[in-house]
Amino acid sequence: HFQNYSSTKEGSLYSISLWGNRIPKGVNKDFVLSTTKSEVSFFSQNISISKGQGNTRNRTGSFSTSFGSKNLFTYPHETGNTMLFPLLILLLFTFFIGFIGIPFDNRTMDNGIVRLTILSKWLIPSINFTQESSNFSINSYEFITNAISSVSLAILGLFIAYIFYGSAYSFFQNLDLQNSFYKGSPKKNFFYQVKKKIYSWSYNRGYIDIFYSR
């Protein structure tokens, strides 16, 4: 039997976050994008074993894995396939309906009764590409300008959401975008306050839960 057995374990470097995942302690969670190198050690223990008198062995057993990557911060859990597939199906229908250009105000009179004829001409596109007139060029220019403005706003929203909730392996993590905004005291910084408001609004689902909790 071993005598004078003693072992010490290193303290845990992780804590439980609001999202149910482990995050490193002592790290400011507001700075989602960080460029600090780190190594992750699953456990490490120092064991001092003594046999009899004058026969002492010191053994250190450790099992560590070095990822050689940057600190991985937790993010909100992404939606699963249960939500993804219905959204993709809805996207396909929306795309083709918008491309075809169904005239929803197309109505006919039948004995004084207004009848909708949406599906009667649903294969007729809203833009006739074989038409050669000045009106066609004007309509095309207006369509392109409106499409560029709306798509640009959508891309801007996706870009902002990707910075806040994107993957830890994203390219923007190397740019250190968020930390560049928080120079000096973060609580007095304008960008810090804006980020805090947006995060609070999205975390509380646009404060809709307040009405349900009443």
From Swiss-Prot:
Localisation per UniProt entry: Plastid, Chloroplast thylakoid membrane
Keywords of the record: Chloroplast, Membrane, NAD, NADP, Plastid, Plastoquinone, Quinone, Thylakoid, Translocase, Transmembrane, Transmembrane helix, Transport
Catalytic reaction(s) noted: a plastoquinone + NADH + (n+1) H(+)(in) = a plastoquinol + NAD(+) + n H(+)(out); a plastoquinone + NADPH + (n+1) H(+)(in) = a plastoquinol + NADP(+) + n H(+)(out)
Annotated membrane topology: Multi-pass membrane protein
EC number: 7.1.1.-
InterPro entries hit by this protein: NADH_UbQ_OxRdtase_chlpt_su5_C, NU5C-like
GO molecular function: NADH dehydrogenase (ubiquinone) activity; quinone binding
Purpose: NDH shuttles electrons from NAD(P)H:plastoquinone, via FMN and iron-sulfur (Fe-S) centers, to quinones in the photosynthetic chain and possibly in a chloroplast respiratory chain. The immediate electron acceptor for the enzyme in this species is believed to be plastoquinone. Couples the redox reaction to proton translocation, and thus conserves the redox energy in a proton gradient.
GO CC terms, sorted: chloroplast thylakoid membrane
Name this polypeptide is given: NAD(P)H-quinone oxidoreductase subunit 5, chloroplastic
Quaternary structure and partners: NDH is composed of at least 16 different subunits, 5 of which are encoded in the nucleus.
UniProt keyword Lyase, yes or no: no
Chief localisation class: plastid
GO annotation (BP), single: electron transport coupled proton transport
TM spans (from-to): 84-104, 152-172
PANTHER family, alphabetized: NADH-UBIQUINONE OXIDOREDUCTASE CHAIN 5
Similarity comment: family membership: Belongs to the complex I subunit 5 family.
